[in-house]
């Protein structure tokens, strides 16, 4: 928010959509009351009249955001290396963000929500609000925005793009084709938040690491090794598994380094257990009551924690078993039936018709599975929204895993048709990339164009004019017409990163689990990912609204899914090698086949061994964390000892005075 001359640059970061006024301004107009209350809070409000709605653009100076952060007790890292609740008076002691601002995008949006939703009727009596002849009551102590939302006055509230930073990111990132995988990660984090910043860092690192298996796969696919040809595929298989295991371990190190660089502590905040017990860290007795009650309450607290923990585990386990059994009993027979019918049909026209019917049914089943998963998750006990989102990822990925790979397994294990398998892999890698690129680029733009067209047509009908072109001049109205960055499944828990991460995980599983059948797939994936970085960047900066920030700073459940796919790759590629070398189909344990089985077990051991050999955190991150924890413990212990000493002196001082008085007499 800093201007070029050292003055604070006013940036409208939040917009609210309200109805366009039909009647003349009247006393008690609810929109006027909202604008007045926002300005009383110290915020800057700009009113923009659009075609069918009015827009309130809201900005908050740094001082106002700082006061809100202090009220929210937002913990921030200080220059001493200790995370402390923010206080505006000591703002210079807190570390600033990479873009020079005091608060991250996630923290600023939290402050905006606190300020806007914190407007309550503190007058002690009800207030009558009006809108175009309609009246409703704003009761004492009620949130104004909640009331306006329930009455349909506030249509939407969404974050706005910062035009200056957006254009800078367009030049340095989305349109900078010379840097294939190098991205301004700090700028992405500052503008979009930690979740999107971590995703693009992961995508860039994954694309860079793909260069090695892409070159190796190109050599294996194109070069004839003569008498040593039978060793080419097993060697390539071993190399790709070791590459994948090392990549995931080094990604954990990079993720830890990013969190340390951005001063993000993932462990901040009380756990669900304390909320379950009716306790918060801020409500714990301190310090004399804590010492007195600690021994009495420890047994009860432990018992309550155990009941809560196992009850939550039991509900999650029940839902997971239900989802797995549904996939096995319902989706697996359907996928096998489609693969079998597709294999025996000879007419290409019937195959296309069958595929179209299959895709329609699959879309319905996937959306149905997503809705069922969300309902099951709502009945679980999860510590946060991110835990619920991870639970959704596991359940929905099971559906997509069955859809994507069961037909390929059918071709491999039953028909052993490697030519058909390669054709299927090429088609899915190329067609899926073209499909996802078209969906990412064209679908949001088509939605945006259709909404603009509908608004213009409605305006022409209201004005009664059939000639002349109606222009949309305001930037905020253009952003209002843009679609949101939302997930195709489970929009209550996930945003558009779900679809992007799902696409990447399915691609990784495709090239890894069938690496021996088509080594050139890694090269296709590398080229695809370079395009993916640019298309996703353009999508976020041009065709979509600015996404809502999320607190998560890791790729979450997707890391476990990638590790699962590595283990599956060891098993599937071993099966591919067995099918390739067992040409007679007798499944005899000959020396070659026995060597493949031994290699499979060795690779499984190496995969888990590498996770122990390569530390998940760089040494400097670990040392910095230990230093910060030590400093925090020292300061807390000194404060606790001073408090106990003060209370002890206050208790013993009257006794000493009485003793001195008795000695005098």
Curated annotation (Swiss-Prot):
Does Ion transport count among this protein's keywords? yes
What keywords are annotated for this sequence in UniProt?
A: Calcium, Chloride, Chloride channel, Ion channel, Ion transport, Membrane, Transmembrane, Transmembrane helix, Transport
For this UniProt entry, the molecular function terms from Gene Ontology, in alphabetical order, are: chloride channel activity
Q: Does the keyword Protease apply?
A: no
Q: Where in the cell is it found?
A: Membrane
**InterPro entries per the UniProt record, alphabetical:** Anoctamin (IPR007632), Anoctamin_TM (IPR049452)
Which spans are transmembrane here? Answer: 200-220, 230-250, 322-342, 344-364, 392-412, 508-528, 551-571, 591-611
Q: Which GO terms describe its cellular component?
A: chloride channel complex
Name the membrane topology term: Multi-pass membrane protein
The similarity annotation says: Belongs to the anoctamin (TC 1.A.17) family.
Its annotated function is as follows: May act as a calcium-activated chloride channel.
The name this protein carries in UniProt is: Anoctamin-like protein At1g73020
Q: Which organism is it from?
A: Arabidopsis thaliana
Lineage of the organism: Eukaryota, Viridiplantae, Streptophyta, Embryophyta, Tracheophyta
């Amino acid at each position: 928010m800093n201007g070029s001359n050292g003055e604070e640059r006013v940036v409208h970061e939040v917009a609210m959509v309200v109805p366009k006024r039909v009647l003349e301004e009247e006393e008690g107009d609810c929109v006027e009351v909202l604008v007045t209350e926002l300005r009383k809070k110290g915020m800057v409000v700009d009113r923009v009249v659009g075609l069918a709605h009015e827009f309130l653009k809201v900005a908050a100076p740094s001082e106002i955001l700082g006061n809100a952060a202090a009220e929210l007790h937002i913990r921030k890292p200080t220059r001493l290396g200790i995370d402390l609740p923010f206080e505006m008076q000591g703002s210079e002691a807190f570390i600033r963000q990479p873009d020079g601002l005091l608060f991250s995008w996630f923290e600023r949006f939290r402050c905006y929500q606190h300020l806007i939703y914190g407007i309550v009727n503190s007058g002690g009596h009800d207030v009558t609000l009006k809108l175009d002849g309609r009246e409703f009551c704003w009761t004492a102590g009620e949130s104004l925005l909640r009331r306006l939302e329930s009455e349909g006055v506030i249509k939407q509230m969404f974050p706005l793009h910062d035009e200056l930073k957006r254009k800078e990111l367009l030049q340095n990132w989305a349109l900078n084709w010379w840097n294939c995988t190098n991205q301004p990660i700090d700028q992405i984090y500052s503008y979009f938040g930690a979740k999107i910043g971590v995703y693009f860092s992961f995508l860039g690192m994954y694309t860079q690491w793909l260069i090695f298996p892409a070159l190796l796969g190109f050599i294996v696919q194109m070069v004839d090794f003569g008498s040593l040809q039978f060793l080419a595929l097993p060697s390539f298989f071993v190399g790709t598994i070791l590459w994948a295991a090392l990549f995931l371990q080094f990604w954990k190190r990079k993720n830890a380094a990013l969190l340390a660089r951005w001063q993000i502590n993932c462990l901040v905040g009380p756990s669900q257990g304390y909320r379950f017990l009716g306790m918060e860290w801020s409500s714990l007795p301190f310090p004399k009551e804590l010492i007195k009650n600690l021994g009495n309450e420890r047994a009860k607290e432990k018992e309550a924690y155990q009941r809560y923990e196992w009850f939550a585990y039991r509900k999650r386990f029940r839902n997971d078993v239900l989802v797995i059994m549904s996939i096995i009993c319902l989706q697996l027979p359907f996928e096998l039936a489609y693969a079998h019918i597709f294999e025996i049909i000879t007419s290409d026209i019937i195959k296309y018709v069958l595929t179209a019917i299959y895709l329609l049914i699959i879309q319905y089943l996937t959306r149905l599975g997503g809705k069922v998963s969300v309902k099951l998750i709502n009945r679980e006990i999860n510590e946060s929204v991110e835990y619920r989102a991870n639970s959704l990822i596991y359940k929905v990925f099971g559906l997509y895993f069955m859809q994507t790979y069961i037909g390929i397994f059918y071709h491999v294990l039953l028909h052993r048709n490697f030519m058909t398998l390669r054709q299927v892999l090429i088609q899915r890698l190329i067609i899926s990339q073209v499909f996802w690129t078209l969906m990412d680029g064209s679908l949001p733009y088509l939605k945006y164009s259709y909404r603009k067209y509908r608004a213009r047509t409605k305006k022409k009908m209201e004005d009664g004019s059939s000639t002349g072109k109606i222009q949309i001049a305001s930037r905020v109205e253009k952003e209002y017409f843009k679609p949101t960055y939302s997930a195709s499944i489970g929009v209550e828990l996930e945003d558009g990163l779900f679809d992007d991460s799902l696409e990447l995980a399915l691609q990784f599983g495709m090239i890894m689990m069938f690496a021996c059948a088509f080594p050139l797939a890694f090269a296709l994936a590398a080229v695809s990912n370079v395009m993916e970085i640019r298309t996703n960047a353009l999508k976020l900066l041009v065709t979509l609204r600015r996404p809502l920030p999320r607190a998560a700073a890791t790729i979450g459940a997707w890391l476990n899914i990638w590790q699962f796919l590595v283990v599956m790759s060891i098993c599937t590629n071993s099966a591919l090698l067995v099918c390739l070398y067992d040409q007679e189909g007798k499944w005899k344990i000959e020396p070659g086949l026995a060597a493949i089985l031994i290699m499979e077990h060795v690779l499984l051991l190496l995969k888990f061994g590498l996770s122990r050999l390569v530390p998940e955190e760089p040494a400097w991150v670990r040392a910095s964390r230990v230093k910060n924890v030590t400093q925090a413990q020292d300061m807390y212990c000194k404060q606790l000892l001073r408090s106990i000493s003060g209370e002890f002196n206050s208790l013993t001082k009257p006794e000493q005075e009485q003793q001195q008085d008795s000695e005098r007499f």
